[in-house]
Amino acid sequence: MSPVDFRLYLVTDRHQTAGRPLVSVLAQAVRAGVRAVQLRERDLPIRELHALVQELQRELPDARLFINDRVDVAVALRTGGVHLRESSLPAGVVRDLLWPSQLLGLSVHSLDGVMAAEQQGADFVVLGPIYDTPSKRVYGPPIGLRILEQAAQKVQLPIFAIGGITATRARAVRQAGAFGVAVLSSILGAENIEQATQDLLSAIEIDS
């Protein structure tokens, strides 16, 4: 099984790119050092999603591409992996469907969720929201650094912190035990995509 060899996990939302083409924004981020992208475009019809994945595989050969929830697309196109929600198919079921080289990520929102993900065989988890952020308010109030610290002490699983992550906050979550960070608007909405990416990468690596 391939290792989790990235610390910055870019999650997509083509509606948050300030009108710029998603593929162009992602290409700039990858050029600046992003090595893992989760394609999270839930409102796209399946054929459009399939075509977009193929385009990204051509345009972003240096990035591991994860598909949110659509295990069928991930398996059919042999992407870098698949990313599940807590309401998705169980991780253990999905694991049996994946190619050996594919990684399995899981989004969780509590300490119990982190521990369950490890037991189910996920390769890594995305935990949050750590800080307040509009895109994550549907999951409830921020859980804060304390839950992150507790989770990092209880599992061996790589934990990516999400929710309101900026370059300054990236240092704090790394110090709290996060393996890495997952971001959307901090990169997608930045005026200078490459600079925003480099700032986050520098912050993440301080305590590596």
List PLM regions with ranges.
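Conserved acetyl-CoA-binding loop-helix of GNAT-fold acetyltransferases
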Residues: G144-I147
